[in-house]
């Protein structure tokens, strides 16, 4: 038999069959919280193997252990190539990666709401068709109100979430699969059978049959001793959220602090969790022990106890956080001999009592500018908001939601003025397009900073024909049509200036003190003819008679609240008038108090019970007189003077 793995140290099980490929060399690396990679150099008697038959398929290696058991290295063929070969054998190169590596080949933009990070991670795995994972987590995790995967691979997304929460993973290998183990504490790890204790033998003692270590190296490095985090919660703006976590070390430079903002939390207990997680990740770099030898059964994620080392304090339990492997098998051309084989590993370890956390290394996505989105809400609603005036939106990039009240988190809306129970407010309505910015570019922290029109949500005035018009126009809700609106509009076209106010139903004006309406008289015109003067005089005579008979001589007090605030809007249409031409131009909306001082609007509070001062007048005004308007006050039962203006004409020389 020309090609057989029967006596080989490492056996290859590939999709092409058990005897098609044989291992010549293996170089592999695995690490807690990182993807493993095994580079294989393989040989085959077939020089024309179909590479696509390997690519993306599972492959495993079986390493012979003392006692006849086996340790497996299982993975997905991520890459394969063919070289020139050696002698009668064709040469192939294969890279094995975990199934998790396939998540580096897919990306998405997606929103998760009201879920814990472990649940988000497992949902991502399942949605992509993977089920070979195990939950060995022991700590509790907060529920994220809003979590966004934004323009990043699914691997980067789950990796940065795990790094933030202090979760890591490692792989348990079997013959037909490898299982990802989610971990966060010592209890997730174990010692492999036969490797609870591994001895150290120095190289001077020569070759030993038992698996052992022959090289040891320890290093310690100064690390920050504490970490403080801070953040802000708009629902509790006065609450101090700063937290601190520290790890004590017995050297002279152990107390240097770190501080960071934002900590990405709104509850202090969550901040304490994040501060502790981050300082523990930093402290995993404080002490590292590297052991080199032939310990074939130990890999990343395993526990073992070192024995027989001369420095006694180093004979302790370790957690393997990283491992490198090298296997070399000599070529042979018959099935009668196995050729020479060699296995060597180098383990990166920490004290088993030191909590392991992965150092953050995954890039966090940054939204590099504002975006637009569409306001959404429940079916049948036109306005959907909460007590803070927040709204929900559908992002144009989100292909998973249904454009309803569950499309996003509540988002605060920037207003022109925001005081304590005062300011301005306009709630974006369902269907309107808004501008969304992100605090520090974080896709998890959106805020609405503006609104824009589009081809469906069009401007209220036809443009560019009405470019001189500006103002505010609303829409009645629910069920309002274009004919149902309130509006304040200004027209700035030269010669056609206008302030237009439209109330769809009621217009109520409440005035606490004076309200003055002044009308500038028309520009000087030619003197009126005698006939027009006579007609004007007759008009004023009739007006005076009606007003004199209708007016009460003093201010009155109303006993009916209904005649107060809602009727303040009653307008006196009469304005002061200049009767004859040629007089100096002046404002004609003057009234006077009892003492003769000018007064605009209603009488003051001190004058409410006094007689209204009325100029003495005998008969109606004549041509050449200036007519002034006085007002009768209507006192109310509510605070604040509110006036129903009734014109009383007086004549002034």
For the regions a protein language model found, what residue spans apply to each?
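Assembly/oligomerization scaffold segments
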Residues: 1-110, 164, 286
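Short alpha-helix capping/helix-loop boundary micro-motifs
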Residues: 39-49, 283-294, 360, 417-423
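Structural signature for extended repeat/solenoid scaffolds and their inter-repeat hinge/linker regions
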Residues: 171, 181-183, 190, 367-584, ...
């Amino acid at each position: 038999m020309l090609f057989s793995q029967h006596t080989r140290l490492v056996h290859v099980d590939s999709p092409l069959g058990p005897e098609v490929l044989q291992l010549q060399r293996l170089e592999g690396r695995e690490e807690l919280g990182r993807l493993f990679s095994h580079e294989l150099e393989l040989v085959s008697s077939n020089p024309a193997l179909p590479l696509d038959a390997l690519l993306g398929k599972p492959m495993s290696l079986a390493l012979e252990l003392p006692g006849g058991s086996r340790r497996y290295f299982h993975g997905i063929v991520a890459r394969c190539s063919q070289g020139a070969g050696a002698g009668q054998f064709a040469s192939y190169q294969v890279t094995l990666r975990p199934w998790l590596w396939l998540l580096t080949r897919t990306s998405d933009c997606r929103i998760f709401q009201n879920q814990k990070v472990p649940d988000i991670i497992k949902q991502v795995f399942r949605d992509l068709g993977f089920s070979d994972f195990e939950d060995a987590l022991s700590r509790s995790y907060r529920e994220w109100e809003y979590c966004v995967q934004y323009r990043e691979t699914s691997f980067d997304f789950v990796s940065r979430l795990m790094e933030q929460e202090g979760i890591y993973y490692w792989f348990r290998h079997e013959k037909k699969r490898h299982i990802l183990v989610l971990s966060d504490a010592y209890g997730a790890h174990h010692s492999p059978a036969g490797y609870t204790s591994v001895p150290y033998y120095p190289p001077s003692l020569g070759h030993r049959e038992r698996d052992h270590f022959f090289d040891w190296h320890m290093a310690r490095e100064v690390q920050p001793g504490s970490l403080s985090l801070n953040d802000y919660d708009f629902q509790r703006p006065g609450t101090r959220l700063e937290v601190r976590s520290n790890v004590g070390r017995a050297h002279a430079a152990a107390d240097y602090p770190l501080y960071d903002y934002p900590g990405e939390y709104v509850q202090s207990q969550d901040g304490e969790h994040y501060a502790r997680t981050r300082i523990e990740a930093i402290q995993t770099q404080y002490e590292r022990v590297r052991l080199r030898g032939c310990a074939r059964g130990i890999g990343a994620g395993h526990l073992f106890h070192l024995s027989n080392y001369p420095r006694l304090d180093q004979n302790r339990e370790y957690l393997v956080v990283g491992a490198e492997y090298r296997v070399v098998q000599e070529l042979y051309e018959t099935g009668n001999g196995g050729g020479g084989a060699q296995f060597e590993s180098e383990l990166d370890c920490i004290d088993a009592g030191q909590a392991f956390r992965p150092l953050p290394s995954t890039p966090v996505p940054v939204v590099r500018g504002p975006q637009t989105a569409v306001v959404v809400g429940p079916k049948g609603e036109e306005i959907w908001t909460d007590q803070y005036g927040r709204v929900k939106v559908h992002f144009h990039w989100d292909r998973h939601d249904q454009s309803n009240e569950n499309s996003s988190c509540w988002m605060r809306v920037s207003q022109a003025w925001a005081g304590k129970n005062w300011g301005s407010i306009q709630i974006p309505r369902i269907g309107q397009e808004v501008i969304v910015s992100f605090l520090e570019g974080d896709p998890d922290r959106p805020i609405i900073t503006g609104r824009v029109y589009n081809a469906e949500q069009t401007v209220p005035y036809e443009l560019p024909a009405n470019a001189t018009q500006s103002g505010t126009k609303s829409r009645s809700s629910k069920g309002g049509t274009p004919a149902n609106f309130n509006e304040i509009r200004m027209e700035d076209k030269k010669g056609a200036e206008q302030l237009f106010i439209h109330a769809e139903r009621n217009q109520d004006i409440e005035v606490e003190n004076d309200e003055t309406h002044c009308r500038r008289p028309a520009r000087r015109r030619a003197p009126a003819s005698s006939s027009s003067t006579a007609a004007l005089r007759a008009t004023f005579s009739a007006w005076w008679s009606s007003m004199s008979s209708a007016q009460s001589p003093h201010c009155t007090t109303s006993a009916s609240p209904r005649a107060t605030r809602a009727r303040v809007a009653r307008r006196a249409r009469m304005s002061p008038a200049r009767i004859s031409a040629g007089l100096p131009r002046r404002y004609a909306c003057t009234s006077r108090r009892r003492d003769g001082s000018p007064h605009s609007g209603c009488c003051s509070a001190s004058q409410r019970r006094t007689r209204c001062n009325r100029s003495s007048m005998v008969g109606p005004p004549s041509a050449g007189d200036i007519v002034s308007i006085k007002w009768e006050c209507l006192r109310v039962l509510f605070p604040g003077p509110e006036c129903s203006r009734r014109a009383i004409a007086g004549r002034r020389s």
